Amino acid sequence: MKKLFVVLVVMPLIYGDKFPTSVVSNCTDQCASYVANVFTILPGGFIPSDFSFNNWFLLTNSSTLVNGKLVTKQPLLVNCLWPVPSFEEVASTFCFEGADFDQCNGAVLNNTVDVIRFNLNFTTNVQSGKGATVFSLNTTGGVTLEISCYNDTVSDSSFSSYGEIPFGVTNGPRYCYVLYNGTALKYLGTLPPSVKEIAISKWGHFYINGYNFFSTFPIDCISFNLTTGDSDVFWTIAYTSYTEALVQVENTAITNVTYCNSYVNNIKCSQLTANLNNGFYPVSSSEVGSVNKSVVLLPSFLTHTIVNITIGLGMKRSGYGQPIASTLSNITLPMQDNNNDVYCVRSDQFSVYVHSTCKSVLWDNVFKRNCTDVLDATAVIKTGTCPFSFDKLNNYLTFNKFCLSLSPVGANCKFDVAARTRTNDQVVRSLYVIYEEGDSIVGVPSDNSGLHDLSVLHLDSCTDYNIYGRTGVGIIRQTNRTILSGLYYTSLSGDLLGFTNVSDGVIYSVTPCDVSAQAAIIDGTIVGAITSINSELLGLTHWTTTPNFYYYSIYNYTNDKTRGTPIGSNDVDCEPVITYSNIGVCKNGALVFINVTHSDGDVQPISTGNVTIPTNFTISVQVEYIQVYTTPVSIDCSRYVCNGNPRCNKLLTQYVSACQTIEQALAMGARLENMEVDSMLFVSENALKLASVEAFNSSETLDPIYKEWPNIGGFWLEGLKYILPSDNSKRKYRSAIEDLLFSKVVTSGLGTVDEDYKRCTGGYDIADLVCAQYYNGIMVLPGVANADKMTMYTASLAGGITLGALGGGAVAIPFAVAVQARLNYVALQTDVLNKNQQILASAFNQAIGNITQSFGKVNDAIHQTSRGLTTVAKALAKVQDVVNTQGQALRHLTVQLQNNFQAISSSISDIYNRLDELSADAQVDRLITGRLTALNAFVSQTLTRQAEVRASRQLAKDKVNECVRSQSQRFGFCGNGTHLFSLANAAPNGMIFFHTVLLPTAYETVTAWSGICALDVDRTFGLVVKDVQLTLFRNLDDKFYLTPRTMYQPRVATSSDFVQIEGCDVLFVNTTVSDLPSIIPDYIDINQTVQDILENFRPNWTVPELTLDVFNATYLNLTGEIDDLEFRSEKLHNTTVELAILIDNINNTVVNLEWLNRIETYVKWPWYVWLLIGLVVIFCIPLLLFCCCSTGCCGCIGCLGSCCHSIFSRRQFENYEPIEKVHVH
């Protein structure tokens, strides 16, 4: 092998003092420019961060990125870097295996070389003298392919002429071909205007300026003739390996590289930035911790079948010598039922294998020769129209039916059978498939027949599961439940909830899980991490606990505290650098809590010129709802789009900063929302106690004046003293003994006749007639007469009758007068009763009419109240809609996961399980595009909603400060009226204000004066009202009065109410018609203006129609409902006024009766009654004493009788035994 002509000298250290820098010997005065193109390899094969990457391009197999950042796998891990000043004009060979790394500049790696990069390092338009005559690629198949370019189109006979690949700027187009033995196999295209880098991969890819010009079989070595020309150009040859890195591209060239090789660099790669600002950043789930894999299958006795497919290829040459696969190639299936055209799998398992043969022909179609050289080909089966790849059939794909056929009759899909040559793939036949989806047949990589239960379970931990064909990530837990049927159980949305293990009959629950963490980065270093699990991560070993998460940090919590001590007891004194809500992280990694300070804004009164001042009011309570906050949402974009699939994550990086923009928008919105809400709201302990029923009922939380509030009636029944009479000094009532000793007669009396009569008689019956009373001019006496009065008048009547003949009839006059007076009393009582009856009948009828009308109004009021409650229900429904808006948006976002966006499946893992990698990438790209669109719509809706809520929150804060904490002077700000006070209460996602206001019902119009212009001896001065809230006016009595503008309360103005100003001059501002639009601008329709502009510049542009299922923002608007409630409240108020009038009418129907007094008269018993009572007492008392004291065995009579009986009785009685009861049967 020819060696490179390289002369190296050791120069002073450029990139540190660890590795010397090798510079070519002929770098005279241009050494500085050479140093910019040569770097010292850092340990690990990394390129220094300050390297300029002059003429280093991003290798791509598709479109070229012009500008941007992306995370990709590129050959940027340098195993060896050779600075080369010039080449010999003989062929030089470079091999991927066994390369000599003795002349490397800097560190040397022994990794596998993937790509050899040839860089021509120059910054100006340098033109090479000759360049490479030809690039020879020695493939692993023993075939040598040559790549060369020509300055014009050539024929077959011209390929032997001179060709080259010039480096630097080329003159005119150069047409390039792939040659084999001097014969063109493929036309590659034209060279770019300036060739600056050639990179060749061991996998057979040939790149020029980063673009893949040609691909072939794997390559062992590269050989080419090269000269540097007349200019002083400089070469570097880099032996590189693929590694994952964040690459910044400008004008298609690499300008900066960040290796994704460390924890902090991985975060830089995920955020697509080389410099991280101080803050919190999400950590990849792979760095948080890995999960085990669980598989649950049905145990069964398995049988296995091997399906061998033999494909015989026929190859021949074209007119240009290129290989062509014949359509006469044949496919042979295993024999089944004497038929080779269709083969169906009849076992539980199967494995498919392809065997390929190749025959060639020169001129005819009889393929007998072996395929050699360029005609050598291998049969491959490509995906075709089937939703699964042929090479994935043995990867545990399941079917209910699976058949292979050579005929399209009855087929569901087909595979393409192709001949793979050294240059391309050519489809020759089709292999048709008849299948049914199911679980009866499974393709396996090897024979696994027999009785098996291949289930593997990892319980009580986050695991990646495949349960009866349903995949996901969750926690599997054993339960004690018993369900009679079913293998697995899902929710209505299709999520797996649990399953039954048929081997032991145990039911397991499945709970979705996702381990997440946030890294705290300060000055580009990870100082801490917030995580949901207690596990070391990101190289952090010290940790502490909080009520909501674990915190790992570089701060050593174990110095003075116990490891894992709660954060509240650590008392770290430091200044936080980054904050989130009420927590912060210091530069040393310590976690601290932040004290939130509150500040109130200044409130300025508003001056008004209204001279119509209210004189009467009605009180109204008006309700206002204001939304204060929304629930923050954080979405892991890569998890939502790819669900952790590594291949999908690689594809997702091609979308540059899509995920970063989505996550940062939501994160910043959530942080701003959290900070503003936290600074606005705080918890009051007293209010929290009053919110509890137990604490509210406790007298400890109430004002001391209520602690000793007496019970009703005082202690026990002490209050009855206010109900029962306590003074009887005037003897208005008789005692209980008097009620017993006298007969009480109750009658009805006229007015005060009876009381005046009693007071006149003084209890003497003889004064009965003398004390006669007069009622309406008629003489009357009480109708009840006692025995003495009856005796007296009887004697008068008897005396008159007896002495009548003798002229003594006048004695009966008192009797006649008394009888007539008592008859008058009875007659007048009857007349009063008749009048009262008429009054009662008329009043009752009128009352019934008023009551009927009143209840009719009450009925209408109740109806209005019912409709008012319906309006309140609608308002509450809107509040509920505000609460559910975000949930509905998230639900819509989740539903999008079930949409396949025209892919064959919505499951990424299922797509890669069924298709080959290239076809699966195309299908997954559709899912990524659709899901990113759904995420963008959701983020737009969320940000719009947050902006609306942010303005609403500021309004709520202003209303709390002005309406609740003070009394607002602004008319209409705290309710529609003059504000009295307001109460605020919590509501879903916001606050409800109850504004108590005065609504004017009558007004007084006055002529207001802005001030008084006064005249002194030698000067004129002005006086204006000191309090601008007062209105100055002059009344008819020529006195000045002041009244508040909110209520008409005039008072005489005094000198203390005024302040003096300089003069009385008034400045008038005159405006013309031309100046008026600048003062009062015309209404401008912004939408129409924008539409006109767009139509002028883009006449064919149309407004896109965004359906609500993509973007749906809900705005809270309770104005209509509140106005409706106020209208109904006003109507109810008017109804109550009418009811008050009707009640007054009912009150006017109160019957003012002439009461017949209830007269109680006590009549004394006659003398003979008292005599009879005395005789009974005299007789009964001695008899009772005798009976009690003398009788009985202990009495006097009893003792005397016993003595006499014992003395005079001679008969002695014998003692007898007591008689017992005898039963006779």
Curated annotation (Swiss-Prot):
Cellular component terms per the entry's GO annotation: host cell endoplasmic reticulum-Golgi intermediate compartment membrane; membrane; viral envelope; virion membrane
Bilayer topology annotation: Single-pass type I membrane protein
Domain of life, per lineage: Viruses
Ranges in a coiled coil: 880-924, 1114-1156
N-terminal signal peptide: 1-12
Motif KxHxx boundaries: 1221-1225
Function text: S1 region attaches the virion to the cell membrane by interacting with host ANPEP/aminopeptidase N, initiating the infection. Binding to the receptor probably induces conformational changes in the S glycoprotein unmasking the fusion peptide of S2 region and activating membranes fusion. S2 region belongs to the class I viral fusion protein. Under the current model, the protein has at least 3 conformational states: pre-fusion native state, pre-hairpin intermediate state, and post-fusion hairpin state.
Subunit details: Homotrimer. During virus morphogenesis, found in a complex with M and HE proteins. Interacts with host ANPEP.
Name by which UniProt lists this protein: Spike glycoprotein
Source species of the chain: Porcine respiratory coronavirus (strain RM4)
Gene name of the encoded protein: S
